[in-house]
């Protein structure tokens, strides 16, 4: 099966649907927000995870031969850095190189934008993501803003890009 990467608008219906699938999967992996949690912490976490469309540089879909979406990723501006966000490859499409192809698309776009590095945030309940990012050359870094206060146990990574 060939995987084709296509850049789409951030509000592309297929991209929105895949981000919804990601939200559902992350709720299963991390658990739902409980009523016991401090509402200010919940609000801070939601704000940290929110991606404003104006900050998105590129949204990519991975498609199979017949155009069926296999995965999604975004690249956003975050201060002086570019951040890989919202990578999702549904379970049925995993182990086919889709995540690798999407990660490569983000890295290539970041280079074209003149970025010095790409950063990302993930967590222990996402071991497949950690393996993918490590295989792509990302290395661990300290938790960075906007995740420090609301998600201090995040696992963060960077990929330094050669000038």
Model-derived segments and spans:
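Conserved G/P- and acidic residue-centered "switch" motifs that form tight phosphate/ATP-binding loops
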Residues: 97
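Extreme N-terminal starter segment of soluble prokaryotic enzymes
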Residues: 2-4
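C-terminal "cap" of GNAT-fold acetyltransferases
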Residues: 10-11, 21, 116-119, 123-163
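Acetyl-CoA-dependent GNAT
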Residues: 6-85, 90-91, 103-105, 109, ...
């Amino acid at each position: 099966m060939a995987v084709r990467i296509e850049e789409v608008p951030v509000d592309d219906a297929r991209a929105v649907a895949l981000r919804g699938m990601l939200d559902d999967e992350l709720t299963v992996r991390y658990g739902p927000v409980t009523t016991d949690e401090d509402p200010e912490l919940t609000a801070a976490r939601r704000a940290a995870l929110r991606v404003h469309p104006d900050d998105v540089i590129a949204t990519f879909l991975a498609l199979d031969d017949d155009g069926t979406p296999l995965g999604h990723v975004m690249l956003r501006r975050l201060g002086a850095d570019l951040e890989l966000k919202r990578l999702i490859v549904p379970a049925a499409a995993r182990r086919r190189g889709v995540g690798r192809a999407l990660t490569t698309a983000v890295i290539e776009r970041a280079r074209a934008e003149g970025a010095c590095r790409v950063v990302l945030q993930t967590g222990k309940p996402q071991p497949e993501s950690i393996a993918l990012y490590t295989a792509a050359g990302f290395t661990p870094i300290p938790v960075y803003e906007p995740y420090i206060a609301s998600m201090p146990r995040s696992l963060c990574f960077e990929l330094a890009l050669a000038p």
